[in-house]
Amino acid sequence: MTTSAVKVLIHGASGRMGKALLRLAAEDQTLQVVGAVVGRSPSQRVVDGVPFFAASELGGAPAFDVAIDFSLPQGFAPILALCAQRGKPLVSGTTGLDEAQRAALRDAAQQIALVWASNFSLGVAVLTELVERAAGTLPGWDCDILEAHHVHKQDAPSGTALTLGEAATGSGAQPRYVSLRAGDIVGEHTVQFTGLGERVELVHRATNRDIFARGALHAAKLLIGKPAGSYRVRDLVL
């Protein structure tokens, strides 16, 4: 690890994404995880050199350069407030946020650099660009977004499906959504444009959850030093 390693606080460290972030960050010499926040009091206070904290102890988290949040909606407000209070950027992939929480995000973007995204993969960033272009180029065509995820995913449609829908709506389409929860599907999104006698399908399939964690870690590095504002993944990586 270099002396100039980016100090990262991981919020939601006990979840699928949190565990992937911890594992991949440990392999990256440019990153130092200075704290991991979990929902309840941790059974071990230090794991592989990383201090663990309960969500109720968030205010006592050590100094960090950027926070990465993959938690639940009910845990989102405290990490957003902490970053705003300390003037540190935030990368968040927590989905299922309500309108009040989205408004809080917009307000916080006046103080800090932040990126909220339902999906941090480079492929989905490209897919979003393609959906935006297709919707604007194919006026009047039906637009349907089909998404499939593992049985444990609670929100539907997925945050990524809604993001793709926003891209389509912004270019004039009126998307409809279909959701499937089955097995251990990591994530599949199909955006279908249907006209008279022809159909266009844009598809992204994730086969490994690590792509999301890698993307979030990469976004965290790129967010360092950015002026206050709300950034999209594609603003940072494309």
From Swiss-Prot:
PROSITE patterns assigned: DAPB
Catalytic reaction equation(s): (S)-2,3,4,5-tetrahydrodipicolinate + NAD(+) + H2O = (2S,4S)-4-hydroxy-2,3,4,5-tetrahydrodipicolinate + NADH + H(+); (S)-2,3,4,5-tetrahydrodipicolinate + NADP(+) + H2O = (2S,4S)-4-hydroxy-2,3,4,5-tetrahydrodipicolinate + NADPH + H(+)
Gene3D superfamilies, per the entry: Dihydrodipicolinate Reductase, domain 2, NAD(P)-binding Rossmann-like Domain
Cellular component GO terms, alphabetical: cytosol
One of the GO biological process terms: lysine biosynthetic process via diaminopimelate
Originating organism: Xanthomonas euvesicatoria pv. vesicatoria (strain 85-10) (Xanthomonas campestris pv. vesicatoria)
Protein task: Catalyzes the conversion of 4-hydroxy-tetrahydrodipicolinate (HTPA) to tetrahydrodipicolinate.
EC number from the UniProt entry: 1.17.1.8
Active site: 149, 153
Residues reported in the UniProt entry to bind NAD(+): 12-17, 93-95, 117-120
Chief location category: cytoplasm
UniProt cross-references to Pfam families, sorted A to Z: DapB_C, DapB_N
One MF annotation (Gene Ontology) recorded for this entry: NAD binding
Positions bound to NADP(+): 40
SUPFAM superfamilies: Glyceraldehyde-3-phosphate dehydrogenase-like, C-terminal domain, NAD(P)-binding Rossmann-fold domains
Annotated localization: Cytoplasm
Name used for this protein in its record: 4-hydroxy-tetrahydrodipicolinate reductase
Pathway where this protein functions: Amino-acid biosynthesis; L-lysine biosynthesis via DAP pathway; (S)-tetrahydrodipicolinate from L-aspartate: step 4/4
List of residues binding (S)-2,3,4,5-tetrahydrodipicolinate: 150, 159-160
Assigned protein family: Belongs to the DapB family.
The UniProt record lists the keyword Nucleotide-binding: no
Keywords: Amino-acid biosynthesis, Cytoplasm, Diaminopimelate biosynthesis, Lysine biosynthesis, NAD, NADP, Oxidoreductase
